[in-house]
């Protein structure tokens, strides 16, 4: 969460916010997260930039994930961070890197690729 504060904002649409929060509350995921995690994510979303969707995107093998691609394209995102394999297989999507959360936590370089240390 500090990375977002230092390096730029988080983008959202009402649909991406709702789906992200719903996924994090699934029992098999919520049981692995610290109690304050969901509150922290909600705090991030409260400061996120709301992006209007002007250009629809239909590209993902799971159509429910197209909303995240639409957000990235319409918001000119620097990257997409996800653990969803249906999105990860599209890396990069229209020049936007798609990385998993572990790569994001390790830190990313200016081009959106994991830094080498």
Stretches with model-predicted labels:
Residues 1-27:
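PIN/NYN-family metal-dependent endoribonuclease catalytic core
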Residues 2, 71, 90:
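Hydrophobic/aromatic ligand-binding patch that stacks against planar heteroaromatic rings
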Residues 14-15, 83-85:
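Short secondary-structure boundary segments
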Residues 29-33:
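Membrane interface segments of multi-pass transport proteins and intramembrane proteases
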Residues 46-81:
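Mid-chain, well-packed structural core segment of small domains
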Residues 58, 62, 75, 79, ...:
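Acidic, PIN/NYN-like endoribonuclease modules and their adjacent C-terminal/linker elements
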